Amino acid sequence: MTTPLLRAVRVARHYGDVEALAPTDLELIPGETVALVGPNGAGKSTLLSILAGAIEPSQGAVETHARVGWVPQRPAHYARLSARENLVLFAQLEGVREAESAAGRMLERFALPVDGRPSGELSVGNRQRLNVAIALLGEPRVLLLDEPTAALDPGQRRRVWEVADALRAEGGAVCFATQNLEEIEHATRTIVLQDGRIASLTVEEVFG
């Protein structure tokens, strides 16, 4: 039996009387890509944030057996620092050797600006690519992505999916949230969420 790289056991999240996510189980095993699909407010971001450790579940637990990279929807970097400065800083925080060299490789890999502008002044697409680059600095085996290509053009989207598909092919696991039905082709498994619960519906029934 394959040991999951990440396992969520009955995780749920409440905000007061509002149930954002009902108790949910999820395993990510090596070599798979899981798509979380559903309309706005379905619980996709909440589930991913719990898996990433960005928010605490109201109940349940998450077991991680591998390094996790996390790409949230919102900027996960310091707006006053340049792309290079952010990458160097996060590389150091991850304990990456030769942080400057690692930052340089990511700048090139994701075609990020090297002109020293604060990242807060970059385009939405550049900021999102910077999020992905930061998530990959620690060479994670699990990559969690919350609508990572929503602000990207086709070429930029292709670059992100090349990275995610390669990680899966190398025995990692990817879990991503999307409302873009074309991106489901990258998934080996699709989970439909609706009203904070895993739904017994097809993608077509949800988006009709």
Which residue ranges define each predicted feature?
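Hydrophobic anchor residue at the start of the ABC signature
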Residues: V132
